[in-house]
């Protein structure tokens, strides 16, 4: 069940990538194989409804082909970060807060991606 929380940020940030067209075509083929729907990823990520449809399709794809889906999303995320499309400038500072007065459990709300990361800090 915890792996589900790991992949939510991957799904969300993979939507925002506009990396190389081979990644987009691989993603398109993967979604087409698993859901039977043919999406144009570059057009789909421009609307909020399209992003929701893409996330749902990726969830279905992960249920049937978890290794292939995770690998593709990690590659896309890496390329997006290397190209500077996902950067620290996009993340608003000051969003880190503690929960339940436990300094070892931090959450960071990232408004840019509209999601929360839960981080366990070990000293």
Curated annotation (Swiss-Prot):
Entry's localization field: Cell membrane
- List the cysteine pairs that form cystine: none
Instruction: Extract the signal peptide range.
Output: 1-19
Highest taxon above the source species: Bacteria
Alphabetized Pfam families for the sequence: Lipoprotein_3
Topology in membrane: Lipid-anchor
Key word Nuclease present: no
A GO CC term assigned to this protein in UniProt: plasma membrane
The question of whether Cell membrane is a record keyword is answered with yes
Q: Which UniProt keywords apply?
A: Cell membrane, Lipoprotein, Membrane, Palmitate, Signal
Q: Which residue(s) hold a covalent lipid per the annotation (N-palmitoyl cysteine)?
A: 20
Which positions are lipidated as S-diacylglycerol cysteine?
Answer: 20
Q: Which family does it belong to?
A: Belongs to the MG439/MG440 family.
What this protein is called in its record is Uncharacterized lipoprotein MPN_054
